[in-house]
UniProtKB/Swiss-Prot annotation:
Protein name, UniProt field: Phosphoserine aminotransferase
A Pfam family of this chain: Aminotran_5
Alphabetized InterPro entries for the sequence: Aminotrans_V_dom (IPR000192), Aminotrans_V_PyrdxlP_BS (IPR020578), Pser_aminoTfrase (IPR022278), PyrdxlP-dep_Trfase (IPR015424), PyrdxlP-dep_Trfase_major (IPR015421), PyrdxlP-dep_Trfase_small (IPR015422)
Positions that bind pyridoxal 5'-phosphate: 78-79, 104, 157, 179, 202, 244-245
Keywords: Amino-acid biosynthesis, Aminotransferase, Cytoplasm, Pyridoxal phosphate, Pyridoxine biosynthesis, Serine biosynthesis, Transferase
Subcellular location: Cytoplasm
Cofactor names: pyridoxal 5'-phosphate
Function statement: Catalyzes the reversible conversion of 3-phosphohydroxypyruvate to phosphoserine and of 3-hydroxy-2-oxo-4-phosphonooxybutanoate to phosphohydroxythreonine.
Family designation: Belongs to the class-V pyridoxal-phosphate-dependent aminotransferase family. SerC subfamily.
Organism: Neisseria meningitidis serogroup B (strain ATCC BAA-335 / MC58)
Catalytic activity as recorded in UniProt: O-phospho-L-serine + 2-oxoglutarate = 3-phosphooxypyruvate + L-glutamate; 4-(phosphooxy)-L-threonine + 2-oxoglutarate = (R)-3-hydroxy-2-oxo-4-phosphooxybutanoate + L-glutamate
Subunit details: Homodimer.
Primary site of residence: cytoplasm
Amino acid sequence: MSLYPIYNFSAGPAVLPEAVLETARQEMLDYNGTGFPVMAMSHRSEMFLSILHHAEQDLRQLLKVPDNYKILFLQGGATTQFNMAAMNLAHGFRTADAVVTGNWSRIAYEQMSRLTDTEIRLAAHGGEQFDYLDLPPVETWDVAPDSAFVHFAVNETVNGLQYREVPCLSEGMPPLVCDMSSEILSREFDVADYGLIYAGAQKNIGPAGVTVVIVREDLLERCPNDIPDVFNYRSHINRDGMYNTPSTYAIYMSGLVFRWLQAQGGVKKIEAVNRLKAQTLYETIDGSDGFYINRIRPNARSKMNVVFQTGDEELDRRFVLEAELQGLCLLKGYKTVGGMRASIYNAMPLEGVRALADFMRDFQRRYG
């Protein structure tokens, strides 16, 4: 057993609230006095349908989702949504637009381009413009008014980039399709500004295995009949999310996280905590006299994924190793970026971030 508290800074699957894990432990063999473990429940049983209903309603309340939006709990991860969004929403359109701001939006653009006859245009490219050290301002996006949609990722986990204000387009422009996997429920935004939102659960929602999709009802009219039903949003909605067996346990766990968020005071309260956590780490980096380096423009720094390095690969490796020995786990940066990355999603307690900041200062004292 570790001498230190264990803090999980993984980018995903990520930390889950301790209270949620405790509830899941207590209900592992007997859910709510039913005698059934959730993992063994039929997805069509009244017991599970109640779990699904409450998860959907709690998410709708947390995000203030308007009535004309449908919520789905699907499988396949956010990467499947790169394809599903294009397959369902681009049908009959000559073009769709994509904004590339980092690793995952780049992959989304590439995948969308493969799966539809619609031309996927680059509305902006943060790599070409800023070497992924800043974000293309929304007002500079080259959006075609008659495009099917505009796809973007609001937070880039690999590069440590995040739009400070959640982007929205003016009336009459194409609907926004947004990958919110790594920041959904971390701050307030207006769902009505978007046509479709998707998010893999394993960062801010719950364990891996479920993907949340929030889609405006009128866009479902675009879904073509000649794509497989399993990839058709309308097929899932027409069957109340039961087209195939959903990820029952991941949905149950996500529902527990939604209840935990409500108990914390909702998204507005968790946003304030997230702001303080990010501030704690960035102040430590900026106050290190150059020992720690974060090259991202300050107004584009992510509050979810804080990337940094020492400028010495061997010292970075030593940092990751020594941090883990003190219970600060999974801080290694993404393979294409290197350095360190601290993912500080909703469930990461402020105490964990402060412990990391203390370790960073101590490490600098010893090796600076």
